[in-house]
Curated annotation (Swiss-Prot):
Gene3D superfamilies: GntR ligand-binding domain-like, Winged helix-like DNA-binding domain superfamily/Winged helix DNA-binding domain. GO terms for biological process: negative regulation of DNA-templated transcription. Disulfide bonds: none annotated. Residues 58-77 bind DNA. Residues 30-98 form the HTH gntR-type domain. Residues 1-22 are annotated as: Disordered. The gene is nanR. SUPFAM superfamilies: GntR ligand-binding domain-like (SSF48008), Winged helix' DNA-binding domain (SSF46785). PROSITE patterns: HTH_GNTR. GO terms for molecular function: DNA binding; DNA-binding transcription factor activity. The keyword Transcription applies. Transcriptional repressor that controls expression of the genes required for the catabolism of sialic acids. Belongs to the NanR family. This is HTH-type transcriptional repressor NanR. It comes from Shigella sonnei (strain Ss046).
Amino acid sequence: MGLMNAFDSQTEDSSPAIGRNLRSRPLARKKLSEMVEEELEQMIRRREFGEGEQLPSERELMAFFNVGRPSVREALAALKRKGLVQINNGERARVSRPSADTIIGEFSGMAKDFLSHPGGIAHFEQLRLFFESSLVRYAAEHATDEQIDLLAKALEINSQSLDNNAAFIRSDVDFHRVLAEIPGNPIFMAIHVALLDWLIAARPTVADQALHEHNNVSYQQHIAIVDAIRRHDPDEADRALQSHLNSVSATWHAFGQTTNKKK
């Protein structure tokens, strides 16, 4: 017996009840800008406008859709957020291809809001741990000599920045970025950059002196990660990475507790 359509189980007696429910919940009307946005998006996806091609002018779009300038501008702004068009001052919108950065950027506001909730930072730190664990195992198994050299160079810059907290944070981010680049997947890179940006932005402000010891510990842990990758030992690389990120998490949690007590 085939699957029954959901409507087949409804009896005639239920029609008045359905009607009452529909009348009590009127359908929301779409804004004109949303309708223009959807139509333009479909035209772009159907290749009616190719990548790099300019869309019609605002005036032409207003006439074509029979809407005002605000609706056209709102629609174009929405398409820009989706990465489907680029808009430069004084020029018509130009069709573009969404990048991994654009896709991740759409979640940025929600991510920052989630981080501000209780437990939010811990959840994102766990996500980072799971994600970088896979990256470091891949690096230990597949990294080329050239890629390992890039890790070693990032490690050297790390060592030169130990007494300068701002520089060390940059070198720390760059070290992990090199790890994320090894698979050659742009989506991995976008996720990794966003994760670190979100987590770093959520960290408390800490006095420079308090960070110096943390910098040295992180640097030594980076050495252990690179050594394991150089030996092509994924298990040891994973252990070193997990030890490092758990240490970072515990340190910043302690900094946060201290900061809260002072308030």
